[in-house]
């Protein structure tokens, strides 16, 4: 049986020792939240604002042996989290940010939450990845 992208992502997060994720579920990341809710190793913490979630993820990296992980929707979710992401980056604190994406196989542009996140994040992250195939999920998270 093939694994979904969400199952692969949660598997990889468990393998690297993530204990908590912080964020807000939305149409672009519902499946991964469904899988996080099944995990016995990871507790998804729902927040009321993405920036607060970013600061919480920062705190986990600063105070535990786990990497702080932010789980957000694209565009508005990512832009709301920028202050917390930038703070972690400037202090050299590791943070893993997983953002949902928009479909790219329809030929339609200007979809809900379509924005060039990689360009925006370039100055305040060490790396940014665009996963296009299921086979890229686990190796990318391990990196």
Protein language model annotation of sequence segments:
Residues 1-143:
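N-terminal alpha/beta PP-like core and its mobile active-site loop of ThDP/TPP-dependent enzymes
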């Amino acid at each position: 049986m093939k694994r979904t992208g969400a199952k692969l992502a949660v598997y990889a997060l468990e393998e690297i020792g993530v204990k908590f994720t912080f964020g807000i579920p939305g149409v672009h990341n519902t499946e991964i939240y469904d899988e996080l809710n099944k995990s016995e190793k990871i507790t998804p913490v729902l927040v009321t604002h993405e920036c607060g979630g970013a600061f919480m993820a920062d705190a986990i990296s600063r105070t535990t042996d786990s990497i702080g992980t932010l789980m957000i929707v694209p565009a508005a979710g990512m832009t709301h989290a920028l202050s917390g992401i930038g703070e972690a980056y400037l202090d050299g604190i590791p943070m893993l940010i997983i953002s949902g994406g928009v479909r790219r196989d329809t030929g339609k542009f200007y979809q809900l939450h379509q924005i060039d996140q990689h360009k925006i994040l370039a100055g305040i992250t060490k790396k940014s990845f665009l996963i296009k195939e299921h086979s890229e999920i686990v190796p990318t998270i391990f990196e």
